[in-house]
């Protein structure tokens, strides 16, 4: 327990523009999930650092989140869609797709699953929230014209948001 390195992982790309430089890993049951600009969703064994699977079906880029119960990993694609995958050690393929129509997207912020909804921001200053079980859009609110950082869902009806332009907003969502 001294902070010693256990393992390192990379996707094999020497180009930092394609490496997982801005991803925030999610984990469940000994598996780490990441999405890098190479547009693969990758599952890594948390004990060994070995790649378990890589999936490029939906071209997820850097933005992921995990369900409250850990059973589902969510990814934001570069065009309009949120995709979901079951968390497991073999490639599950896409569980579902939800077209939210947000357009071209590249903000590396997390999708936050809390209080039965998943909430995230986009490069155009719009915050979205969807029901991961339906799946369907619950609400969307434009707060600015710049990139939205990872949101802070405070309660089932209150979300705190900041943008790259320095705008801080508290949203009442119900």
Indicate residue ranges for each PLM-predicted region.
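Short loop/turn segments that connect beta-strands within beta-propeller blades
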Residues: 1-2, 45-48, 86-91, 131-135, ...
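Hydrophobic packing within well-folded, soluble alpha/beta domains
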Residues: 32, 41-44, 49, 127
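Extracytoplasmic beta-rich repeat domains
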Residues: 4-28, 53-69, 91-114, 140-156
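Short loop/turn microsegments at loop-to-beta-strand junctions
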Residues: 39-40, 125-126, 157
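Conserved beta-propeller blade signature
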Residues: 32-34, 72-75, 117-120, 128, ...
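Hydrophilic extracytoplasmic domains
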Residues: 122, 133-174
